[in-house]
Amino acid sequence: MTDRYILAVESSCDETSVAILKNESTLLSNVIASQVESHKRFGGVVPEVASRHHVEVITTCFEDALQEAGISASDLSAVAVTYGPGLVGALLVGLAAAKAFAWANHLPLIPVNHMAGHLMAAREQEPLVYPLIALLVSGGHTELVYVPEPGDYHIIGETRDDAVGEAYDKVGRVMGLTYPAGREIDQLAHKGQDTYHFPRAMITEDHLEFSFSGLKSAFINLHHNAKQKGNELILEDLCASFQAAVLDILLAKTKKALSRYPAKMLVVAGGVAANQGLRDRLAQEITHIEVVIPKLRLCGDNAGMIALAAAIEYDKQHFANMSLNAKPSLAFDQFPDSFVIN
């Protein structure tokens, strides 16, 4: 059997990445050019800055990914690219590069949903068992997804306001922590105690929706009031209390989803899946079903996860033509207008 190689491109936010996947789940390379240092002084991602950085480094990422994988363009079977959701300018840079490369090398183009990529990152460490439920937690999304079979995604719950990663970054900014703040808050939380009371929005309600805006506002109000009154707050305890509230919400909704849908596996993915507190709680509280979390290097945005998701679409011969466009608000159940089934 001839080996299959997929080159994948990811540029939906502030990471420029190109990866090479061999067959179903072997990543030969996963080159990531991070922009974190450029955005730190702004306390968040500036779309125009992100787009310009993508343009500067994407060609080098292509070259490095192929060199690291030890193959040439003539060995490739397909090109995959994130076409949404994400920042429109950032998406267009990766999309233009992927389309040009695919056209020049006469390769089929596979459109990949960024969040499907996060979910399918778990495929690298072991085969996924269906049906499964996925908890996707990142800076832009918080979703519960039911996946009855490969490539078939159904959102069963999502945030009504802030994404969980967004809440981490916003409270981190209030505390004067470095962007992105999630890792530092997690580390501080492990040194503190849950002593401050924060709301757990909708935690007892019957639906599977999330809300983090009230928690974020309560945290900011507590911090500002204490500062105005000259009261000292213990940073470690603040982080521990905030994180305890976040994890209570995530675990409660995930358990409800598992009780309502026939699932053989739980996948937890996205940037916030790197959170050690979340990993610890999952290990302690969800023991009746296998929990799969991608390795730390695949939790953040990267093209490796896009390639792993693309392998599913390749098997189904789901390709797009060169009119494929960026979809910044792409939903899980939305297919590209240029979708072609061969």
From Swiss-Prot:
It comes from Streptococcus pyogenes serotype M6 (strain ATCC BAA-946 / MGAS10394). Substrate binds at residues 136-140, 169, 182, 186, 275. Its cofactor is Fe(2+). InterPro entries: ATPase_NBD, Gcp-like_dom, KAE1/TsaD, TsaD. Belongs to the KAE1 / TsaD family. This is tRNA N6-adenosine threonylcarbamoyltransferase. It catalyses: L-threonylcarbamoyladenylate + adenosine(37) in tRNA = N(6)-L-threonylcarbamoyladenosine(37) in tRNA + AMP + H(+). One of its GO terms (molecular function) is iron ion binding. GO terms for biological process: tRNA threonylcarbamoyladenosine modification. The keyword Acyltransferase applies. It comes from the Bacteria. It holds the Pfam family TsaD. Binds 1 Fe(2+) ion per subunit. One of its GO terms (cellular component) is cytoplasm. Required for the formation of a threonylcarbamoyl group on adenosine at position 37 (t(6)A37) in tRNAs that read codons beginning with adenine. Is involved in the transfer of the threonylcarbamoyl moiety of threonylcarbamoyl-AMP (TC-AMP) to the N6 group of A37, together with TsaE and TsaB. TsaD likely plays a direct catalytic role in this reaction. It is found in: Cytoplasm. Keywords: Acyltransferase, Cytoplasm, Iron, Metal-binding, Transferase, tRNA processing. Transmembrane segments: none annotated. Fe cation binds at residues 114, 118, 301.
